[in-house]
C-alpha cells in the first residue's frame, strides 16, 4: 500500500536548520523522508544526513533514497546520543530535526491499528519489532491498570467505566480489531453524539502506552 505524505512546515524547517552545504544533519523522525529529501538537495558532496526511525516501514521506505550522503538507522529518537556516538558524529552535528508523534502513513494504514475509524488489528506499535501491542494491553491488563492508562495518558473522564466494561466484555470474547474496540467504547461512554469520536482519548492512551511515548 502506497501513501503520499506532505512534510509539516517544510520551508520553516529548512530555514530553521540554516543548512550548510557541507554540514552534518540528523532527521531523527524520518517518516517517509519528505524533510530528508529536501535537506539532501541543499547538501554538497561533503554533506551528510542521517535518518532515524523506529518504524520498520519507514526504514524500508528510506531504501528508495540511493544517495551515498544518506544513512538510515532503525532507532527511536530517544537513542539519539547513542546512535550519534556509534556513527562517530557526536558533537559534530550541525542540526537535528524531530517531528514528534504518530505519522500520517501510520494512521492511514488500517493494518497498523492506530485508527478508530478504519478496521484493523489492535496493534498500534510504531516499532513492529517490539512485542507489546494494544491487543495485549486491552485483553490482559487489570482493570486498575487500564483505568490508569485511560485517565493519565488519555485524560478520559470515563476511564474507570470504560476499563470495567472492557474487563467484563473480554471474559466473553477478547477484543481483536480497532473498530470492535472503538464501537464498544462509544457504546460504553454513551451520551449525545459529539464531533470527536468517543474513543479518541482511549485510543490515544493505548498508543502512548504501547510505544512508551512518555519515556522518549
Report the location of each language-model feature.
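S-adenosyl-L-methionine-dependent methyltransferase catalytic core, i.e., the SAM/SAH-binding region
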Residues: 1-216
Amino acid at each position: 500500500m502506497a501513501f503520499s505524505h506532505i512534510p509539516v512546515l517544510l520551508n520553516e524547517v529548512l530555514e530553521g536548520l540554516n543548512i550548510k552545504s557541507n554540514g552534518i544533519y540528523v532527521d531523527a523522525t524520518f517518516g517517509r523522508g519528505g524533510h530528508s529529501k529536501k535537506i539532501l538537495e541543499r547538501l554538497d558532496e561533503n554533506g551528510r544526513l542521517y535518518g532515524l526511525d523506529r518504524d520498520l516501514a519507514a526504514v524500508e521506505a528510506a531504501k528508495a533514497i540511493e544517495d551515498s550522503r544518506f544513512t538510515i538507522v532503525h532507532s527511536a529518537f530517544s537513542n539519539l546520543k547513542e546512535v550519534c556516538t556509534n556513527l562517530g558524529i557526536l558533537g559534530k552535528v550541525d542540526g537535528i530535526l524531530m517531528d514528534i508523534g504518530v505519522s500520517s502513513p501510520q494512521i492511514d494504514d488500517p493494518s497498523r491499528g492506530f485508527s478508530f475509524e478504519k478496521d484493523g488489528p489492535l496493534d498500534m506499535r510504531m516499532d513492529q519489532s517490539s512485542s507489546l501491542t494494544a491487543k495485549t494491553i486491552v485483553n490482559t491488563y487489570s482493570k486498575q491498570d487500564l483505568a490508569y492508562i485511560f485517565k493519565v495518558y488519555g485524560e478520559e473522564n470515563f476511564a474507570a467505566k470504560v476499563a470495567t466494561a472492557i474487563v467484563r466484555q473480554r471474559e466473553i470474547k477478547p477484543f481483536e480489531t480497532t473498530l470492535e474496540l472503538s464501537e464498544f467504547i462509544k457504546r460504553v461512554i454513551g451520551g449525545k453524539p459529539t464531533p470527536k469520536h468517543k474513543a479518541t482519548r482511549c485510543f490515544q492512551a493505548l498508543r502512548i502506552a504501547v510505544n512508551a511515548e512518555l519515556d522518549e
